[in-house]
């Protein structure tokens, strides 16, 4: 009998006895390998989930049987799971020029509440070392509804794309609407952050510079709420002094006009703030995570905001110990946040922790290693939260030490110290009751 079953059985046998709060553990999570083919090396996964039990995972897939450190001829794969059951699996990229060192790398995925997935990645199909941002819109059954290039101009380098998807469609619920952001490098000019908004799979509403045009700007992320507006964060050095903050703005649905003035998500300005991650819920409340070393010790920090852009609390350190890097964040419809990160080192580990809307941790997912095993190397951690407080995670795993990674998917975590069965969660969803 599992811990979950025992708790639920006790509550049924003894009247008015509620299950005692129990910290979630990795053993309570259902683990599966996201990629169905183990050949080669799978890297840099990303994950999204919606309110209806669907989870989408994307990754780089290099089927070469040698040199796992070399991402030449990597393709982009997408797999959808419905209530934990595998659905479709698709190769979305189109290879490249024969004999060339082509690559498709750094994918990201978003998912609306109907189950439509949007995937973006950096593509170099001719192997000339110059990347553009490709996207695909995929239906709940795995049909490609639209494809294209997010950036209008091929000039320069377009790298590190991210995508946010309107959960209920915009401008109508029948549409698939999304925003794409990326880092744009033109020759020797400092990098900027670009954003493009789409109101349908092939209907582009705008392309704008999301960051300031002065200074240098890197590695954006984006989240889209039901309003259709795009929240954008990035590594910002607008004054070109070499010190980075976390830039933050919001762009209008149809025009890309700035509707939340450009500002910094972090209040502490000492040291370096980098690798921003953002997530928004249906109402537009959002949370931001990033790396910071302003205390003298690098760690992962987070801060939550209202839909109007007002901070709910000062930034809080989420990680414990040293070596925490590359945060990933999620938020539910009760404004509870969850933050994941990788602990760097010879044998990296992946961790997660939950936060209340005010930045406290009582009652939320306890800080812990959240992987199937801690043997060997686990890294490239990504997570997503549903409106109900469910948490899905993925990461790359090399527990056998052969240097070839697989993508592990973990389902069944909740951002709460109260464990519940899948049946109980479905009943709560049917009643419209938050899991808080």
Task: Enumerate the predicted regions with their spans.
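Secretory targeting and sorting signals
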Residues: 1-23
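Absolute N-terminal positional cue centered near the fourth residue
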Residues: 4-7, 27, 52, 423
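Intrinsic disorder/low-complexity segments in short proteins, especially the signal peptide
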Residues: 12-13, 17-18, 256, 360, ...
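Extracellular, repeat-based ectodomains that mediate carbohydrate processing or recognition
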Residues: 21-417, 436
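C-terminal cell-surface addressing/anchoring modules of secreted/extracellular proteins
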Residues: 414-436
């Amino acid at each position: 009998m599992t811990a979950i079953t025992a708790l639920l059985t006790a509550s049924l046998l003894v009247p008015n006895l509620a299950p005692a709060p129990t910290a979630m553990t990795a053993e309570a999570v259902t683990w599966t390998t996201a990629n169905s083919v183990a050949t080669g090396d799978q890297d840099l996964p990303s994950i999204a989930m919606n309110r209806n039990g669907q989870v989408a995972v994307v990754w780089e897939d290099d089927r070469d049987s040698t040199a796992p450190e070399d991402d030449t001829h990597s393709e982009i794969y997408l797999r959808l799971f419905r209530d934990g059951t595998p659905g479709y699996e698709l190769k979305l990229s189109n290879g490249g020029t024969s004999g060339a060192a082509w690559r498709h790398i750094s994918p990201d995925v978003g998912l609306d509440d109907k189950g439509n997935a949007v995937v973006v990645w950096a593509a170099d199909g001719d192997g000339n070392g110059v990347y553009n941002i490709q996207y695909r819109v995929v239906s709940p059954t795995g049909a490609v509804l639209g494809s294209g290039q997010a950036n209008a101009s091929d000039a320069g380098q377009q790298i590190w794309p991210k995508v946010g998807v309107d959960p209920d469609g915009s401008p109508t619920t029948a549409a698939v609407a999304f925003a794409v952001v990326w880092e744009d490098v033109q020759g020797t000019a400092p990098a900027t952050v670009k954003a493009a908004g789409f109101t349908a799979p092939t209907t582009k509403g705008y392309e704008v510079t999301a960051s300031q045009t002065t200074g240098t700007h890197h590695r954006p992320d984006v989240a889209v709420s039901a309003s259709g507006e795009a929240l954008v964060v990035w590594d910002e050095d607008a004054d070109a002094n070499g010190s980075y903050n976390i830039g933050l703005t919001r762009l209008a649905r149809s025009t890309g006009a700035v509707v939340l003035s450009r500002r910094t998500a972090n209040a502490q300005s000492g040291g370096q703030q980098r690798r921003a991650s953002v997530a928004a819920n249906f109402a537009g409340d959002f949370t931001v995570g990033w790396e910071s070393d302003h205390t003298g010790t690098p760690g992962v920090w987070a801060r939550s905001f209202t839909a109007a852009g007002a901070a709910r609390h000062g930034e809080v350190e989420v990680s414990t110990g040293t070596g925490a890097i590359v945060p990933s964040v999620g938020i539910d419809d009760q404004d509870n946040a969850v933050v994941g990160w990788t602990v760097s080192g010879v044998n990296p580990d992946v961790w997660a922790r939950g936060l209340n809307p005010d930045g406290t941790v009582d009652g939320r997912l306890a800080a812990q290693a959240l992987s199937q095993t801690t043997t060997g190397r686990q890294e490239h951690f990504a997570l997503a939260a549903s409106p109900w407080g469910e948490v899905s995670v993925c990461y790359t795993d090399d527990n056998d030490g052969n240097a070839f990674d697989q993508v592990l998917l973990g389902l069944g975590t909740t951002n709460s110290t109260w464990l519940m069965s899948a049946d109980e969660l479905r009943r709560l969803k049917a009643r419209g009751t938050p899991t808080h």
